[in-house]
């Protein structure tokens, strides 16, 4: 932490102020993504034709397996893992409904298949699609003492699929909790004795199960794994690689446009104390939705994301309490006339927020969805109020109880805010009823916020305390309960398990809102697991984050 004295003439009675500067690392990307070289139109058109031809071939293969559920499940699994399931949403929906009705509702189990892999795959794919199939289907793999049978010990493929399936568990499914421990322990003991590619697949799953992985990032990893299996579907693999490259071109174009916009604002110079993280922010947004139909939605959320990241740092790492009070009041008024009442350094940020929202408002008006702006503004106001509450705690050196801390910290996690903004560009599916549901703070939102807040606090609290940050949940919990830091981490890990079960429960049918809206919440939660699993990868951009960004936005797939 470094204290700097900065004159602020526009704040009454303040001549020199001592500020705790966080010294965030600068952006590592520079202008790398500003320039975008468009692909030759003829080559682009040829690739698009190939994609359409391959899509038709895959559709025919799906249709041909209608009476072969295991083959159909394997094709569906591959399309999802390769990141191309969005092309076949209707076909996959119909196939899974057919499988559910004919193998579960009519028979109450997955008849005709007694191996662990097949049953676990069936269970996982149906659960992923919202069907609450019973975990009793795994009873056949347990002995009379309710332990999983010793005969499963060497079935690495089946154990891996069981391990993946257990991450779809909900509350009260102790069998799946036991199955997770059993599969995880056994896989850890045999992984070094397995051959490639299964060994690599097991290692990856033990680090990050499918349920917590970002679909686009998981696809990049799965390309080489899938290709290494002799049984891979060549049409699927080629389609996935071509589609990946076409989408990557679109994403690079979007990022190039955003990079020019961001540079024109010159926030890096105007707010040198704040994190300059446009590229990392765009990676975050790609985690929420990568599909081409959400291009407008991405452009909206990345602009707002960069604004709120700067505001967060103004509250956390620069502003005085008096200045922050002025900014908070200006946000509540939401009026360009409030500019005159702000310190000079705050004005560009406040003005840019209003400009971005005006731009979004014009787009919403064109779509006949102006009602969405009420929610977008209200959620911003509430977020800033939360930042102000934390700033007061920090100023007073107050350490709240964990129960007092969490309601504010869930707001400042920003995840209700980001979910709201993520809905703005999603078209008619984001109805007024959907926004009202979101603002009722349903369990799935609280769970998503909890994952964000708990993982953020676990990974960033030491750096934050070194620079004079508000007490994190770790400090609050340690002080209130008189426990060690490791004991606090253990409790947070238990709460993370609970939160993921809440999310799984809320993603089961019947859906309270359309599934695409729930997927934004699930994907936002997944982003946190990717960026904050071992460190705060957003603030301190190290190898893991660099590699993830490069894999999605720099390195094409070799077809």
Swiss-Prot record:
InterPro entries associated with the record: Isoprenoid_synthase_dom_sf, Terpene_cyclase_plant_C1, Terpene_synth_N, Terpene_synth_N_sf, Terpene_synthase-like, Terpene_synthase_metal-bd, Terpenoid_cyclase/PrenylTrfase
Cofactor note: Binds 3 Mg(2+) or Mn(2+) ions per subunit.
Function: Sesquiterpene synthase producing the monocyclic sesquiterpene alcohol germacrene D-4-ol and helminthogermacrene and minor amounts of bicyclic compounds such as alpha-bulnesene, gamma-muurolene, alpha- and beta-selinenes, when incubated with farnesyl diphosphate.
Domain of life: Eukaryota
Molecular function GO terms recorded: magnesium ion binding; sesquiterpene synthase activity
Metal-binding keyword on record: yes
EC number: 4.2.3.-
Residues at which Mg(2+) 1 binds: 312, 316
Protein name according to UniProt: Sesquiterpene synthase
Family designation: Belongs to the terpene synthase family. Tpsa subfamily.
Binding site for Mg(2+) 3: 464
Organism: Santalum album
């Amino acid at each position: 932490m470094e204290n700097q004295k900065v004159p602020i003439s526009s704040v009454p009675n303040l001549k020199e102020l001592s500020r705790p500067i966080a010294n965030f690392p600068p952006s590592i990307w520079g202008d790398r993504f500003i320039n975008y070289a468009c692909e030759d139109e003829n080559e682009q058109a040829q690739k698009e034709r190939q994609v359409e031809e391959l899509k038709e071939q895959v559709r025919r293969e799906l249709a041909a397996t209608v009476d072969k559920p295991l083959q159909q499940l394997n094709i569906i699994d591959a399309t999802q893992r390769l990141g191309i399931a969005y092309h076949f949403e209707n076909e996959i929906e119909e196939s899974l409904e057919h499988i559910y009705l004919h193998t579960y509702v009519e028979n109450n189990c997955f008849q005709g298949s007694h191996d662990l892999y097949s049953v676990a795959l069936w269970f996982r794919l149906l659960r992923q699609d919202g069907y609450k199939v019973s975990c009793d289907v795994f009873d056949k793999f347990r002995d009379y003492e309710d332990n999983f049978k010793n005969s499963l010990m060497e079935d690495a493929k089946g154990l891996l699929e069981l391990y993946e399936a257990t991450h779809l568990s909900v509350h009260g499914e102790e069998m799946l909790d036991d199955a997770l421990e059993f599969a995880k322990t056994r896989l850890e003991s045999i992984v070094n004795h397995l051959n490639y590619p299964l060994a690599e697949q097991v290692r990856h799953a033990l680090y990050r199960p499918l349920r917590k992985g970002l679909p686009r990032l998981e696809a990049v990893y799965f390309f080489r794994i899938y290709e290494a299996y002799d049984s891979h579907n060549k049409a699927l693999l080629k389609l996935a690689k071509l589609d990946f490259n076409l989408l990557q071109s679109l994403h690079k174009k979007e990022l190039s446009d955003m990079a020019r916009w961001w540079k024109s604002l010159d926030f890096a110079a105007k707010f040198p104390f704040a994190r300059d993280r446009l590229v990392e922010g765009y990676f975050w947004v790609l985690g929420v939705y990568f599909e081409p139909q959400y291009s407008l939605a991405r452009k909206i959320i990345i602009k707002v994301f960069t604004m709120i990241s700067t505001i967060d740092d103004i509250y956390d790492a620069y502003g005085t309490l008096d200045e922050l009070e002025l900014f908070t009041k200006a946000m509540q008024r939401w009026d360009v006339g409030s500019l005159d009442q702000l310190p000079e350094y705050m004005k560009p940020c406040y003005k840019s927020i209003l400009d971005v929202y005006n731009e979004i408002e014009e787009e919403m008006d064109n779509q006949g969805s102006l009602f969405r702006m009420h929610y977008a503004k209200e959620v911003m106001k509430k977020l800033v109020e939360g930042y102000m509450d934390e700033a007061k705690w920090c100023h007073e050196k107050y350490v709240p109880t964990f129960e007092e801390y969490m309601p504010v910290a869930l707001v400042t996690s920003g995840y209700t805010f980001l979910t709201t903004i993520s809905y703005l560009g999603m078209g008619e599916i984001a109805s007024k009823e959907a926004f009202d549901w979101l603002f009722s703070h349903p369990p799935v939102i609280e769970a998503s916020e909890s994952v964000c807040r708990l993982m953020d606090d676990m990974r960033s609290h030491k750096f934050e305390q070194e620079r004079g940050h508000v007490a994190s949940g770790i400090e609050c919990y340690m002080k209130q309960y008189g426990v060690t830091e490791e004991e606090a981490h253990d409790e947070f890990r238990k709460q993370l398990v609970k939160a993921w079960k809440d999310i799984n429960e809320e993603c089961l049918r019947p859906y309270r809102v359309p599934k695409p809206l729930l997927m934004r919440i699930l994907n936002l939660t997944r982003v946190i697991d990717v960026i904050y699993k071992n460190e705060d990868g957003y603030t301190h951009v190290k190898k893991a984050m660099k590699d993830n960004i490069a894999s999605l936005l720099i390195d094409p797939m070799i077809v």
